[in-house]
């Protein structure tokens, strides 16, 4: 009997030891967190969005799907619909709820469209376990982070916490740089168009404001020019009206997805090619193979709210990442925006690596992100000001030549 008691005691000790070891192992098992992208995967932006997701996948592979002590899982959300062929308000609203409901998700890379961000950000801001962070590679509307339209940006942050960040600069700088460049090309009169959406109206307004400051003659009425209807079959009547005013340039504020191809075709058909009457667009027309394939796009000027890939440093992470992407996918990234998606994800991973893995702590760590230029996929350091904006105000000017975006110059707006 005594012998059996000893056996039982020994068994108990072993069981307790195994329990302690098992508990310790369970506590030290790596935690998996989810990061996501929220992009339009259908319609005109599909190629660019696919390229952005590919950049992120490659970046995650290079860091072995780790951020500090955490394993990282990547989830892709689609904020577009097949019916609309672009981002959709209702889909953006649904995605916002899905981000919050996904218990392992701690941060969102996106969105591409500023209007979609204005729907999602307030929902993430009010997440009881957050706020949840969103870092955009492409939103350029100023109102997300600074005073622009009435109530902006306060209405996007009901809790008072700024959970939104972006790695590209804003349209107040883009519009100013575009107008300055237009003047340098001898433009004295301009007709401004916008796509009637958040982004298009914002950049058209910024261009118009700067053009007026530069004493250019703005022939269009209103602070953001004239809106075009994306559902129109053609725009010949619009350009026939404009032709009578004899403008030196047409400035098109908007995105290519909204029937931009037809707009460009009819501009050239009625007003002549882009040497006769100049044409300029913002970054909502960059990165679209269908736009570059148009004969009517030749000679069009473009602006981009950051550095074009051509302007990335020829050393460091920016250079090596371009080589790695080409090797992995057999072609270069579709757009600079795609690579800035990688920069946005680098910021997110840095914050996660220094956090305790909760949404709230990832948010708190975002404020101190500081990735040196040599380690950045875009070749400039990744840092944010108090509003959540990048500290850089670089605008790249490009021209379409032989179906390719060709870099002309960089303008740094003060």
Language-model segment annotations:
Residues 1-34, 65-68, 412-414:
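Short, low-complexity disordered leader/linker segments with a strong preference
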Residues 30, 47-52, 62-153, 167, ...:
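Beta-alpha junction/loop-to-helix N-cap segments that form part of ligand/metal-binding clefts
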Residues 37, 99-113, 131-137, 191-194, ...:
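Periplasmic-binding protein-like
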Residues 85, 103, 151-270, 311-316, ...:
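Extracellular/periplasmic Venus flytrap/periplasmic-binding protein
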Residues 324-338, 349-407:
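Segments of small-molecule ligand-sensing domains
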